[in-house]
């Protein structure tokens, strides 16, 4: 039974994207209805889903609604929940669409998410809140290599590379070197060095 109609980004099939109406079921007793303000776009996973190049895994199919980096505000929440309506949250996707696969379902105006998967955010973060998932990935990577010490070299200066470099400075107080081939990703004025690999003065 349809609980709510909303607007969503939908990959109808490989190579075909539409923005159209989608149907949500009613939230379960442990779920919240969230109104989205922003949703990040993954240039890896979601691009592969759009082009049809994503390796098969259980649940993959079309049509699908992408999005696992959503920031919005709670509209409805369970009785007694600390996430009251109006609370700004990060959501790693949606579980509630009935006419498209939720992979991962966050790129829609309204989404349904289990309460325990929502992370409250300061309102002032705004659209920058969508970086939470990538920041968590970077932090997890740094924690996994703690026994070996902080990274001296980071390869790639995309969003994840930038987060790794900045978190290395914050957590370890050390300055990493970053290799990046694309000149557009080597801006001036950073507090760490970004080189084309062949221009790095270190050769060890």
Regions found by a protein language model. Name each.
Residues 2-8:
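Short structural boundary motif marking the start of a folded domain
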Residues 13-15, 28:
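Residue-level recognition of beta-strand termini and adjacent short loop/turns
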Residues 19-24, 71-73, 88, 110-112, ...:
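Conserved hydrophobic/aromatic beta-strand scaffold that supports enzyme active sites
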Residues 25-41, 53-95, 124:
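Glycine-rich beta-strand-centered segment in the early N-terminal region that forms part
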Residues 30, 199-204:
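A short acidic, Gly/Pro-enriched loop at the edge of an enzyme's catalytic core
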Residues 43-50:
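Cytochrome P450 core scaffold surrounding the K-helix E-X-X-R motif
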Residues 89-155:
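NAD(P)H dinucleotide-binding glycine-rich loop of Rossmann-like/cofactor-binding domains
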Residues 128-198:
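Mid-domain Rossmann-like dinucleotide-binding core that forms the NAD(H)/NADP(H) cofactor-binding site
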